[in-house]
Amino acid sequence: MRVRGRAWKYGDNIDTDVIIPARYLNTSDPKELAKHVLEDLDPEFRSKMKPGDIIVAGENFGCGSSREHAPLAIKAAGVSCVIAKSFARIFYRNAINIGLPILEAPQAVDRIETGDELEVDFSSGEIRNLTKGEVYRANPFPDFIMEIIKAGGLVEWAKRRLKG
């Protein structure tokens, strides 16, 4: 599985209240949540990002409240994956559960800049910076996690397994 998109780079400790502000938590409609993703951090993100773009961030991405709305809003906005130095554990689990690919790649984060064109191969863990001509490595997903992501999340994966 590969994705390609432009990088949007942010710093450390981007918490779930910044990813999707609490004032929008009166809905769980992914399309509605997507309209407001990262709006307090970067008011232009939603209007300028294109489907397939990639969020790149520092340490502890997704810290704070353990709400599934945060990765859901990111995925519904059309972001193809998130690359960070590290993730809050509950965000990591919620992202996998809803089928949002995420990779921990500190070296990549140090080198990638906003606007760089990236290509990510999840099966190998390879991140290509097409703008700079550089290649970075992340640990690839284990097969069972890749299956969950390809299925669109844990619920869809479980439905497929139950059908046989």
From Swiss-Prot:
GO function terms (MF aspect): 3-isopropylmalate dehydratase activity
Pfam families: Aconitase_C
Top-level taxon: Archaea
Lyase recorded as keyword: yes
A Gene Ontology biological process term: L-leucine biosynthetic process
Enzyme Commission number: 4.2.1.33
Reaction(s) this enzyme catalyzes, per UniProt: (2R,3S)-3-isopropylmalate = (2S)-2-isopropylmalate
Keyword Ion transport: no
Pathway named in the protein's UniProt entry: Amino-acid biosynthesis; L-leucine biosynthesis; L-leucine from 3-methyl-2-oxobutanoate: step 2/4
HAMAP family referenced in this protein's UniProt entry, alphabetically: LeuD_type2 (MF_01032)
Free-text function comment from the UniProt entry: Catalyzes the isomerization between 2-isopropylmalate and 3-isopropylmalate, via the formation of 2-isopropylmaleate.
Protein family: Belongs to the LeuD family. LeuD type 2 subfamily.
Quaternary state and interactors: Heterodimer of LeuC and LeuD.
Name of the featured protein: 3-isopropylmalate dehydratase small subunit 1
Gene source species: Pyrococcus abyssi (strain GE5 / Orsay)
